[in-house]
């Protein structure tokens, strides 16, 4: 498997380190010695899952609500172990205490939240070869196929549809662009932002962060949109900038300091961000990984709490991929 480093919140052993101590520097969680490649890491409130390129899923952390395993007596998965799935997996997302997968046959399954088995979510998808992807945050999930976005879960802020309601148990059509395919959905705790294949924001709903106005952003293109629970971040690779919207009570807004090297990757966790830059050193490149935001569990490095500015957490000769969880940070090499 790819070599995976993790740090941050670990009270339910969600970092896969074999202990339950929070860590403030990158720790090797997966040694990277069996050939499998990590495609994606998704995290809930206290559990983590990794999807590999062969369609397998492994997980660790909290199982008190059936997030990972069917054994109700198993309250905690101490180390990475396989998650039994109905079929090979092509995508995965996590809510606070739930796990949702899309299998190779285009079916959507959910477990957790008190359910200890995968049960099928009947999303009205077309039986064609269009990509199907799932995204989740806190108490919401959405599934994307072509021009359509379907969602279920909390609707207390009208993030799925109007009028507001406590929860939608069955998937509903959230949005249909009608023409251009949806690329992805960026989700916060009470809101979502839908982005098309041109990097344009086509829809936003729910309790949007302070300062974000949909009409002001819809004319822009080639954006990468990322969300924390309470903020929105727009990465413009051409301008080498990250623009943030929200209150920033714990330094979640991107620090407006000059970057001397190009940004090559950005990810967000619950209330922190992870940034990768490419640095030229002679004839070779090296890559720096920084964090910013709320680092209460060491997920932004040794300087815990709300630290202004970018915190350097690692330097690598190969380009890393980065993922953010609930006060956890992941680096994949």
Curated annotation (Swiss-Prot):
InterPro entries: Ran_GTPase-activating, RCC1/BLIP-II, Reg_chr_condens. GO terms for molecular function: ubiquitin protein ligase activity. One of its GO terms (cellular component) is cytoplasm. RCC1 repeats lie at residues 1-53, 55-104, 146-197, 286-333. Pfam families: RCC1_2 (PF13540). It comes from the Eukaryota. Keywords: Cytoplasm, Repeat, tRNA processing. Changing residue 229 to A/C: Abolished interaction with KTI11. The keyword Repeat applies. GO terms for biological process: protein histidyl modification to diphthamide; protein ubiquitination; tRNA wobble uridine modification; ubiquitin-dependent protein catabolic process. SUPFAM superfamilies: RCC1/BLIP-II (SSF50985). It is found in: Cytoplasm. Together with KTI11; associates with the elongator complex and is required for tRNA Wobble base modifications mediated by the elongator complex. Association with the elongator complex is mediated via interaction with KTI11. The elongator complex is required for multiple tRNA modifications, including mcm5U (5-methoxycarbonylmethyl uridine), mcm5s 2U (5-methoxycarbonylmethyl-2-thiouridine), and ncm5U (5-carbamoylmethyl uridine). Together with KTI11; also required for diphthamide biosynthesis; diphthamide is a post-translational modification of histidine which occurs in elongation factor 2. Interacts with KTI11/DPH3; the interaction is direct. This is Protein KTI13. It comes from Saccharomyces cerevisiae (strain ATCC 204508 / S288c) (Baker's yeast).
């Amino acid at each position: 498997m790819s070599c995976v480093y993790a740090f941050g919140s670990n009270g339910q052993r969600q970092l896969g380190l074999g202990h339950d101590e929070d860590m403030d520097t990158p720790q090797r969680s997966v040694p990277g010695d069996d050939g499998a490649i990590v495609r994606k890491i998704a995290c809930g409130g206290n559990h983590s899952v990794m999807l590999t390129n062969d369609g397998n899923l492994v997980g660790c952390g909290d199982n008190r609500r059936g997030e990972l395993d069917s054994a109700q007596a198993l309250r905690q998965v101490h180390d990475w172990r396989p998650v039994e799935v109905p079929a090979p997996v092509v995508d995965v997302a996590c809510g606070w205490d739930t796990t949702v997968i899309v299998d190779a046959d285009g079916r959507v399954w959910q477990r957790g939240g008190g359910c200890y088995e995968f049960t099928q979510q009947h999303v009205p998808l077309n039986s064609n070869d269009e990509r199907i992807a799932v995204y989740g945050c806190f108490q919401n999930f959405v599934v994307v196929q072509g021009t359509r976005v379907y969602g279920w879960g909390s609707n207390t802020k009208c993030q799925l549809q109007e009028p507001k309601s406590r929860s939608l148990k069955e998937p509903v059509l959230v949005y249909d662009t009608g023409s251009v395919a949806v690329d992805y959905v960026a989700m916060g705790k009470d809101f979502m932002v839908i982005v098309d294949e041109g990097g344009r924001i086509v829809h936003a709903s729910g309790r949007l962060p302070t300062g974000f106005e949909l009409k002001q952003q819809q004319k822009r293109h080639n954006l990468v949109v990322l969300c924390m629970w309470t903020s929105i971040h727009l990465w413009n690779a051409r301008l080498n900038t990250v623009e943030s919207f929200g209150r920033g009570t714990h330094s979640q807004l991107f620090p407006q300091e000059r970057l001397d090297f190009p940004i090559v990757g950005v990810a967000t966790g619950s209330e922190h961000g992870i940034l990768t830059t490419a640095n030229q050193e002679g004839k070779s490149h090296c890559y720096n990984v920084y964090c910013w935001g709320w680092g209460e569990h060491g997920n932004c490095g040794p300087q815990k709490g709300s630290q202004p500015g970018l915190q350097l957490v690692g330097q690598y000769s190969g380009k890393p991929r980065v993922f953010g969880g609930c006060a956890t940070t992941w680096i994949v090499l």
